[in-house]
């Protein structure tokens, strides 16, 4: 039958889309973890809407992977209930992704503000807390930055000499290189702006990926509905 052949094609395309969903799920989880790592490095301890975004992204990725598994089982067994469940869950994921995108846009400035406040707060403990010093040094070294807004923030730290910055601010790091420094020998840009730039760059990547994922999800919903209709009508699509 022509319809049977058409449904076989739809079923095959649905399998391809399910593989794409798995890849998208892994991508979302990776992006969420990467953003969460940056938030941890920026020492943002407060639980706010901005800091929860990566957790939501990871959760959506994990749920998408689970939904793809349900869809695969439903398509393989040609189970009406599983395919309906797959289509409904896929629609819910699309709504959550839209909500996350809106939240990311709304709270973008708040995230930067969190970075700044938390970074400056922890700078006060640089000379008295070795753990904090290690984290800040790692952050400054990896991001090639110095201070929150810029290197002059270190001048306001109790116990820190006016002509000194941490060695991790130096372009070429050696022991004591932060003493009697020159602007030409250190990174002058603040870490808050550096991290904010990283986040802005990745927000664009996430936005582009989200559009691609949304398109694939729409196709998934359409194909699953076609398969559901075929199953309900009693066609054999093995």
Swiss-Prot record:
Q: Which residues are glycosylated?
A: 130, 150, 172
Q: What is the protein's major site of localization?
A: membrane
- Where does tissue-level expression of this protein occur? Detected in mast cells and platelets (at protein level).
Membrane protein topology class: Multi-pass membrane protein
Q: Which GO terms describe its molecular function?
A: protein-containing complex binding
Does Transport count among this protein's keywords?
A: yes
Which stretches of this protein does UniProt put in the Cytoplasmic compartment? 2-11, 73-81, 225-238
Identify the CDD domains for this entry: CD63_LEL (cd03166)
Domain of life, source organism:
Eukaryota
Q: What is this protein called?
A: CD63 antigen
Q: Which organism is it from?
A: Rattus norvegicus
Lineage of origin: Eukaryota, Metazoa, Chordata, Craniata, Vertebrata
Gene that encodes it: Cd63
């Amino acid at each position: 039958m022509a319809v049977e052949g058409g449904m076989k094609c739809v079923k095959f395309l649905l399998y391809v889309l399910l593989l794409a969903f798995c890849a998208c799920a892994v991508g979302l989880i990776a992006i969420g973890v990467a953003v969460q790592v940056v938030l941890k490095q920026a020492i943002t301890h407060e639980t706010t809407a901005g800091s929860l975004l990566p957790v939501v992204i990871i959760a959506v990725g994990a749920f998408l992977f689970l939904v793809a598994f349900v869809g695969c089982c439903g398509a393989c067994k040609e189970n009406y209930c599983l395919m309906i469940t797959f289509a409904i869950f896929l629609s819910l994921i699309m709504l959550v992704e839209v909500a996350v995108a809106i939240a990311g846009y709304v709270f973008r400035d708040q995230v930067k503000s969190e970075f700044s406040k938390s970074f400056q707060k922890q700078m006060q403990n640089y000379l008295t807390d070795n753990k904090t010093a290690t984290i800040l040094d790692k952050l400054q070294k990896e991001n090639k930055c110095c201070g929150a807004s810029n290197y002059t923030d270190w001048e306001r730290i109790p116990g820190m000499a006016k002509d000194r910055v941490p060695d991790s601010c130096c372009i070429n790091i050696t022991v004591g290189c932060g003493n009697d420094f020159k602007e030409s020998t250190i990174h002058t840009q603040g870490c808050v702006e550096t991290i904010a730039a990283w986040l802005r760059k990745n927000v664009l990547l996430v936005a582009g990926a989200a559009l691609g994922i949304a398109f694939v999800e729409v196709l998934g919903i359409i194909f699953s509905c076609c398969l559901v209709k075929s199953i309900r009508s009693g066609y054999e699509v093995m």
